[in-house]
Amino acid sequence: LMKNEKLYFTQEIDEDVIDYVRNTPTCQNVVRQGNIIYVTKIPYMAKKYFREKDPKLKRYYYCHCPWVREAIKSDIKISSNFCYCSAGYEKRPWDVIFNQPVKAYVLETVLKGDLVCKFAIHIPEEYSKISRQLKGKRVNKSRLET
């Protein structure tokens, strides 16, 4: 993508963007700790975000939500609860995977002055129990094949 100067989901990609994704395990991937899955959004305007020094503009370039970006730009205070919309977006695939609604929480958000948006997705208890039972056990792959 970088060599061909093509956009990736409307974004220019350069080494700074690649380094960020590579060095932030929760970005574009997930990290599981216990029964919680952590997710960090990738900056919306990544190249501008990485080059920006002003914290306000950095938050502006980070956010995917046009309403929040305009609030940041215009110095309009809105509740960080507004970011539960993004938490809903992040949790939706997990609702499908676990075949039930999961709980999602906003841990960090540009609306609270953070420079990233990070979410916690709670794994349903019955799936946590299964993983605890399997922990340390070998799985016979032939039994998993259909």
Region locations from a protein language model:
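Amphipathic interaction/junction segments at domain boundaries or subunit interfaces
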Residues: 1-79
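N-terminal, helix-rich and Lys/Arg-enriched segments in bacterial and organellar proteins
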Residues: 22-23, 34, 74-75, 88, ...
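Short terminal or interdomain "cap/linker" segment that borders an active site or interface and mediates
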Residues: 48, 81, 100-146
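Disulfide-bonded cysteines in secreted/extracellular proteins and peptides
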Residues: 63-65, 83-86, 117
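Conserved short secondary-structure elements within globular domains
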Residues: 83-105
